[in-house]
């Protein structure tokens, strides 16, 4: 079924104005709650042990760095920060335990809703777990910290293996947006391919390759080609990267799209007329699934998130509807999708969920 979506804006973490709209909703029948108790759940991946690892933005904090370093422009900034981010894991039976906590977490200004970011995503290289930080940096209220890639050690400690704050500051993109510029970046999603990590940064607009402990290389300056379109989601199909975007405020109908980026950085648009993309994933048959945060509303609205499957050129089949402020998704070993739900916003703490979406057999 082809759908002409009305775009809603998901703006948390990305330096764009946000209003959370509450409403009544009903999830599609193939959606169930798999686990609860998360603080702003974000990217999630299954590990080699069969457990699901969930990154959490945390609950922000009250520490300020005003007067110490450059701040994110108002009304998004100034940020405050704390060490409330964490990574949790969920067993196949739904039992939740903490892998590592006390990681950097920040929140926007009160005028912007105290919206939280922290650990943005996780990925495995072999049996080693890595985390993508978006909640650190002096511009986010935490002096002496940096956004980057953390290696999670067997004893639960972490080691910084790539300083992405430093990389951004010394390798500017062609077309940064000064009105909401984030010095430390607002990293969003990460995938592993061939033992290398690939991460998307929405505020600057880039896809970067990270060799843990070695070096960082920009694969594509999306801002140079597309301008400030706020790329968020990345998936890899074994040959190329696929990147989805939110687009910017004010709202424009059907403004999100999916782009293909080759390992050489060549970019082409492959799917259009989508809304508020926050997740992409391929199934075992190579079919692409798209997670939309909101549709049919002018602002992010609970109960209007959806998962679509690409069935031909700009034809999309609904797989799940009625999701509430979803932020990421991944396929499980059972062939079903797992989605971070109630994944952004201010407290209450512990309101985040992971949903299980049974994917139709067709």
Task: Describe each model-derived feature in a short phrase.
Residues 69-92, 96-123:
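Blade-loop segments of beta-propeller domains
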Residues 51, 95, 127-130, 148, ...:
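Generic structural signal for coil-to-beta-strand starts
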Residues 37-49, 83-84, 105-128, 146, ...:
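Beta-rich, blade/repeat-based domains predominating
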Residues 59-63, 136-140, 204-206, 248-251, ...:
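Short glycine/acidic-enriched loop and turn motifs that connect beta-strands
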Residues 53-57, 130-133, 199, 242-245, ...:
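Residue position within the beta-strands of beta-propeller blades
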Residues 32-33, 96-103, 156-167, 217-223, ...:
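Beta-propeller fold detector
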Residues 90-95, 152-157, 211-215, 261-266, ...:
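Short loop/turn segments that connect beta-strands within beta-propeller blades
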Residues 75, 83-88, 147-150, 206-209, ...:
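A short loop-to-beta-strand structural motif that recurs across blades of beta-propeller domains
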